[in-house]
Design a protein with these regions (language model features):
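Short, surface-exposed beta-strand/loop micro-motifs that present aromatic residues
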Residues: 169, 176-189
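Residues that act as N-cap/strand-start positions at coil-to-secondary-structure junctions
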Residues: 164, 174-176
Length: 274
């Protein structure tokens, strides 16, 4: 059984609306977006910003006969999550678990607002990394989950947070390829926004697995009946983790150098060397 579910976030939306007498969209706009200066985060993208949306999520699946079926019905700037659509995201009803469009700047503003206690108190922020799952009998572990986030934990098989980060660190991944990492102790934040599904194959029938081609860089593509190739996203998560690990490693090293070179002249030298 997978302990992860987004149903809790959907239920939390209803609780928030009942307690505050506000729509969930109104609540997070006032309590999060404005406090974090998130000016480019929208449930319904304004028409003047549509061209800035990165993709339409034209994802594909391969059927048993090798036919590739691509979803071209998704309009740029509209949700593709089926549960979000069912709840009414395209009509302006915030689902609670998905459906918002944002930018890297807004997401870093959000992460920094968390660290700087503009949204939550330090106690509440730290409590997000209290594991709600993970412990098993005989000193064994499963994946650690906190308050709708993935946590740092001992077993490398289930590792979700880069080891050198503090024990209060947490990570929130997105199905479409995004990832937000927050370390409130070391004050390190990282956001990755990448199209895991757009113009890629995310599901292949077992009969067609032999038609997967792997190159020298371990990049997988699927050979279509006409001989052309289409990228397969099955290894996307692994590739993203390599990128995230390198970026966080650089951030930690840079932070260490800041402690060694305490003056601006010294850090200017470090920046020049990099």
């Amino acid at each position: 059984m997978n302990a992860y579910t987004d149903m809790g976030a959907m239920i939390l939306r209803i609780v928030v609306e009942k307690v505050t007498n506000m729509s969930f969209n109104e609540f997070i706009t006032e309590m999060i977006f404005k406090k974090a200066n998130m000016v480019d985060t929208h449930l319904i993208v304004p028409s003047e910003k549509i061209e800035r949306v990165a993709n339409e999520n034209f994802s594909s699946i391969v059927l048993s006969d090798g036919t590739v079926k691509t979803n071209y019905n998704n309009v740029k700037g509209t949700q593709h999550d089926p549960k979000a659509i069912a709840i009414g995201a395209k009509s302006g009803i915030a689902p609670g678990h998905a459906g918002y469009f944002s930018t890297k700047n807004d997401m870093i503003n959000f992460a920094n607002a968390l660290i700087n206690e503009k949204i939550l108190t330090k106690e509440s922020l730290y409590s997000m990394s209290d594991t709600e799952t993970g412990f098993k009998d005989n000193d064994k572990y499963a994946r650690f989950y906190g308050s709708l986030v993935f946590l740092k934990q001992p077993d490398p098989e289930f590792l979700s947070v880069y080891p050198p980060l503090s024990g209060k660190s947490f990570m929130s991944p997105g199905f479409a390829g995004t990832q937000l990492v927050v370390d409130p102790i070391n004050k390190i934040t990282l956001f990755v926004g990448a199209p895991r599904l757009h113009n890629r194959i995310y599901q292949i029938h077992k009969n067609q697995i032999p038609n997967i081609k792997i190159d020298s860089h371990n990049m997988k593509t699927f050979i279509l009946p006409d001989g052309s190739e289409k990228i397969v996203c099955s290894d996307y998560t692994k590739a993203k983790e390599v990128l995230v690990t390198l970026a966080l490693d650089l951030a930690i090293q840079y932070q260490l150098l800041e402690k060694i070179f305490t003056n601006e002249k010294g850090m200017h030298l470090v920046r020049e060397l990099n």
